[in-house]
A protein has these predicted regions:
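Fe(II)/2-oxoglutarate oxygenase catalytic core
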Residues: 1-87, 95-130
C-alpha cells in the first residue's frame, strides 16, 4: 500500500491493478560454496495456490555481510554486494535475469519474496480454499 502511495504513477497507468507483498517468503542459508548459481527470473506461470501467477517485483534481504557474495544481474552487468540489512527490490520478469554469487569461504543467508499484482484478500482466500 505504501509503495503505491509513494509511486502514484503506477495507479495512474494501471488503475485496475493493486499490489500486495506476498506473505509467503523464503529464508535461505547457503554453506560456503553453495548458492543459486543458475541464471533465472522470478516470474512464475504455476497454478499452485502458494505461488500467484502475477509476480511483479522480487525482493532480497541480505541477512549477513558476504565478501564477493551477493546477486549478479545479467542484462544490467551489475553485481549487488551482500551487506547485512540491505534490501533490494527489482522487476520479477526477464528484464532482470539474475543469479547468486557464491563465496567459497563464508555462509550466506538471505530472505527472498515477491510483490504481486492483485489483492491480498483474494490470495488469502485462495490459500484457505486449497
Amino acid at each position: 500500500k505504501k509503495y503505491l502511495e509513494d509511486h502514484p504513477l503506477i495507479k495512474e497507468c494501471c488503475p485496475e491493478q493493486s499490489l500486495f507483498v506476498n506473505p509467503i517468503f523464503n529464508l535461505q542459508r547457503y554453506a560456503p560454496g553453495e548458492g543459486f548459481k543458475k541464471w533465472h527470473c522470478d516470474w512464475t506461470i504455476g497454478n499452485e495456490a502458494t505461488e500467484p501467477v502475477n509476480r511483479v517485483l522480487a525482493w532480497i534481504l541480505y541477512c549477513n555481510d558476504v565478501n564477493s557474495g551477493g546477486t549478479e544481474f545479467h542484462w544490467q552487468n551489475h553485481h549487488e554486494i551482500a551487506e547485512r540489512g540491505k534490501l533490494i527490490i527489482f522487476p520479477a520478469g526477464i528484464s532482470h535475469i539474475h543469479r547468486g554469487r557464491v563465496n567459497n569461504n563464508e555462509v550466506k543467508t538471505i530472505a527472498t519474496g515477491w510483490i504481486n499484482a492483485g489483492k491480498l484478500e483474494n490470495y488469502i482466500s485462495r490459500l484457505a480454499n486449497s
